Amino acid sequence: MVLTEMSLDYSNRVLGSQKDNVKQMDKEETQQKENMLFSSQEYAAKLQKENMTLMKALAHRNKLVELSGIEIQKLRINLRSVQEKNLQLAQANSQMLAELNTNRDRLKDLQHELGCKNALLKVKKHLEEQVLPRTHHESKDKVSASASDGDCKSFQVHDIKHKDTKRKRTTRIKSSVSADVKPIPVNDSNSKANRKRRVSGVIDTTGIPEEICQTEDDIDKGVVSRGVNQDIDNVVNKKFVPDAANPVKESVHRKRQCTRRQSTRFDVQETKQTEKLLEMDGAKESKETASFSLRRRSARLRHEEAEPCKSLHEGDEVRETIKRRRVSLRLSARFDIQEPHVTETSNADDARSIVIEESAGSRSESVEPSESRHETKEITRKRSFSTRRQSTKGKSQTDEAIKEIATDPSLVNTIVQECDQETESKDKPKADENEGMTRRSSVGRPSRHAAEKVQSYREVSLRVKMRRKC
């Protein structure tokens, strides 16, 4: 019984405890539910608040983006304007630099012109200091007389090239350029300008052009030296008219006239000697002597060209001259026919030395006294006489040799035939030789391969190389 009671009590206790536990559990659940309700409401409120803040941030960001886009557009517009301004400034800078360079060039040119003008003014002052007054009454009369005599023709000396192309001419005498002569109208203005010309101490005789006034009668007679002397006197009288107040000027005038007259006399005598030697020697010797004499003369002394003998192509006279020439050429070993060459070369050398001494004397007139001038005149006269004597000796010896040879009748027929063949063979290659001499600019030197024009620096292809005809 006791056990049952005790079991009943225990079961009751257990049941009571279980009931208490269930009640507690229910209470806890209800509390949790209440807590959950409060927490969800709060959480929703929090979420709403956060959403509002985010919306505000988005709106602010959009505003910032719009503002930044507007600023970017403004900056782009400013950049374009700055670039345009930069281009304008660059163009202006380039224009300014170009103007600066042109102005510098103009400044250099103006400085050069200013220097030239200053030099010209100095020279003008120097010339005005050294001006000597002149009178041109006599020169006017002489110019009018020479203009009324006949038309003046300029004589242009043609350079005759020698056969020996290796020989080169090394003369220091400058050739004066011949100019066409026109009748000079004498006016008061020209006379005033001529009065102010400078009488330099160094007298340039090469400045006067070689003018030959020839009429038909003078050409037929061969009188050329008179026209030359008249024209030279006219030019000298134009430039240097003696003045009573200036003894130095008178001495210069006399010295110049003497040198001119001596040079023209010597030139005429030399041409006569060359004509006589041409009649005696063969065609080869005639060519050599003419070229030799014309080479050695200065350009202001040359006023005649060596003319070939016209009697070579006329009938019986041709045969006689051919006989004499051929015989003289064959028997040059027996008779000393080389003397005319020697005399002629000596004449040419003497002429050259006389010309050089005369030019040197004319240059040193401003320094040397009058005694040295007279001595130079005497020396030139003695040399001209010695050259004349040598030429007459050579002429007499060659004439005697020709007379002795011309008497032999056995050589006549062979000489005539051979000379006819020689004249024909000589006349043919004349034009060819002249053309060959004019074509050749440099003798004995082939054209260099490196001096040719390069068409392209590109390497030639193999096919083109193989096609070459080497």
Curated annotation (Swiss-Prot):
Any one GO biological process: maintenance of meiotic sister chromatid cohesion
Keyword Ligase tagged: no
Keywords from the UniProt entry: Chromosome partition, Coiled coil
Basic residues bias locations: 163-172, 382-392
Cellular compartments per GO CC: chromosome, centromeric region; nucleus
Disordered, as annotated region: 131-176, 358-470
Coiled-coil segments on the chain, per record: 72-113
InterPro entries documented for this protein: SGO_plant, Shugoshin_C
Pfam families registered for this protein in UniProt: Shugoshin_C
Compositional bias ranges of the Basic and acidic residues kind: 131-143, 150-162, 370-381, 396-406, 423-438, 449-462
Family per similarity comment: Belongs to the shugoshin family.
Function per UniProt: Dispensable for both meiotic and mitotic cell cycle progression. Required with SGO1 for full protection of centromeric cohesion during anaphase I. Required to prevent precocious release of pericentromeric cohesins during meiosis. Acts redundantly to SGO1.
Additional notes on this entry: Shugoshin is Japanese for guardian spirit.
Name used for this protein in its record: SHUGOSHIN 2
Lineage, uppermost ranks: Eukaryota, Viridiplantae, Streptophyta, Embryophyta, Tracheophyta
